[in-house]
Regions:
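Interhelical loop and helix-boundary elements at the membrane-water interface
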Residues: 2-41, 75-79, 96-127, 147-177
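Short Lys/Arg-rich amphipathic alpha-helical segments
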Residues: 30-49, 85-89, 93
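Interfacial segments of multi-pass membrane proteins
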Residues: 40-53, 125-131
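Membrane-interfacial segments
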Residues: 53, 57, 61, 104-112, ...
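Membrane-embedded alpha-helical segments that form the functional core of polytopic membrane enzymes
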Residues: 78-100, 131, 135-144
Length: 190
């Protein structure tokens, strides 16, 4: 089911939007490993946003124990506005990515075309939603997402069997969720 050979995006007028979205503005056309390039593009965009919304976020801001993207309080687990914005972006990218991935898959005749990386973007952002906005933690988030996306532990591989864009997107969202949970544990101790 993991049919990811190299190919080019759909280029017809009705599918141009799907090719642009599906490749995440061309990141999926980079070689080798278009999925990794899609994840790196997602990470770079997320870090750019983190620097804009958390000015001065190089290293000293979390020394007080206050985390910029989530915190435990008397009322429970609280997410910051940047974490919530990241989760909203995941929802929007998924809503747009499912039909785009479906269209590109139909056009290419492949179940999961390698150049479609919008799924990696959604999954990577899901892992990054609770990440500390610094490079060491962001790179760990990248590695965790790629690990779960490539190895596809249970039940991620089963999600690939869903039809069209659903299977393309949901297995990466599950990998992103696995990465988020492991990153949450790692950040508790690091």
């Amino acid at each position: 089911m993991n049919d990811r050979p190299s190919s080019t995006p759909a280029t017809g007028k009705k599918t141009l939007w799907a090719g642009v979205v599906g490749t995440f503005f061309g990141a999926g056309l980079l070689k080798p490993g278009p999925g990794t390039w899609g994840s790196v593009a997602a990470l770079l965009l997320w870090m750019s946003g983190a620097l804009l919304f958390h000015p001065g976020t190089s290293y000293g801001w979390w020394a007080s124990g206050v985390h910029p993207n989530y915190a435990w309080s008397d009322s429970g687990f609280v997410l910051t506005s940047y974490a919530l914005a990241t989760l909203c972006a995941v929802i929007i990218v998924t809503a747009i990515g499912i039909p785009a991935a479906t269209r590109v898959a139909e056009e290419s005749g492949r179940e999961d075309p390698g150049h479609v990386v919008i799924d990696e973007v959604a999954g990577q952002w899901l892992t990054l939603a609770i990440c500390r906005p610094d490079w060491p933690h962001a790179l760990v988030a990248l590695a965790l997402f790629r690990l779960f996306d490539i190895t596809k532990p249970w039940p991620i591989r089963k999600l690939e069997a869903l039809p069209g864009g659903w299977g393309i997107m949901l297995d990466d969202l599950a990998a992103g969720l696995y990465g988020l949970v492991v990153l949450l544990v790692i950040q508790h101790w690091w």
